[in-house]
Regions:
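Extended, largely alpha-helical regulatory/partner-binding modules appended to the mid-to-C-terminal parts
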Residues: 23, 76, 80-87, 105, ...
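P-loop/Walker A NTP-binding region and its immediately flanking N-terminal helices
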Residues: 1-171, 181
Length: 248
């Protein structure tokens, strides 16, 4: 079954995250010292690593064998979170769950201790989409959270998040990625996937990505799919091509 490249190559640990060293270094230091906030707010344009870092942080706080603040990726907790089967680490899309009732359900469930991991983690993506009533309900649990609870909020529109929420979160700004940072990652993915692509094409995709790694990988995927489909059709008639070549 084909897997989108941006999912296949999503960062699994802090060292995999491109272009956000100040963020990842600070998070690792907090994890090593145990000086974690109860609520984080990740801000920045789309595709800069906010959700990926949120998931890595969720693994790190629950990892059974952490290494200098980084999750091992191998223990049962890490694997369950990676597979999306951990019921105590929940990712919520505020764009489609923006009402007060959704947040009240979250708030009611948050009081229970986690069943299989150390901390219950709520990752709320595009948090700026919550209604005013939903923000007020969220504020009540963020103000006095249980010790076993961690909130990680992510937004592309910081100005729409109420000041009452901002003041109770530790904020991290994710910067737009440079074209050379994106190009380096695209070259790595192309090599791993046996996609033969001209350097000029990689550089063009990196510029078109406009600072977002996810868009860059999606563009690479879209260009490669044309040759993948051709290769599949040729395989049906027993003709093979050794590599996929992408020239823009």
């Amino acid at each position: 079954m084909y897997q989108a490249l941006y999912r296949k190559y999503r960062p699994q640990t802090f060292s995999d995250v491109v272009g956000q060293k100040s963020v990842t270094d600070t998070l690792r230091a907090q994890l090593e010292t145990g000086k974690l906030s109860h609520a984080y707010l990740f801000t920045g344009t789309r595709g800069t690593g906010k959700t990926s870092c949120a998931k890595i942080l969720a693994k790190a706080v629950n990892c059974e064998n952490p290494n200098h603040g980084a999750p091992c990726g191998l223990c049962p907790s890490c694997r369950a979170i990676d597979e999306g089967s951990c019921m105590d680490v929940l990712e919520i899309d505020a764009a489609s769950n923006n009402g007060v009732d959704s947040v009240r359900v979250l708030r009611d469930d948050a009081i229970y201790t986690p069943g299989t991991v150390k901390m219950r983690v709520y990752i709320i993506d595009e948090v700026h989409m919550l209604s005013t009533a939903a923000f007020n309900a969220l504020l009540k649990i963020i103000e006095e959270p249980p010790a076993h609870l961690l909130f990680i909020l992510a937004t592309t529109e910081l100005q729409k998040v109420p000041a009452t929420i901002l003041s109770r979160c530790q904020r991290f700004a994710f910067k737009r990625l440079r074209p050379d940072e994106i190009a380096s990652r695209l070259n790595f993915i192309a090599y791993q996937e046996h996609i033969e692509i001209e350097p000029e094409a990689i550089n063009l995709l990196a510029r078109l990505a406009d600072g977002g790694m996810r868009d860059g990988v999606s563009l690479l995927c879209a260009q490669a799919m044309e040759t993948i489909e051709k290769q599949y059709m040729l395989s049906l008639i027993h003709i093979s091509e050794p590599t996929r070549r992408v020239v823009i």
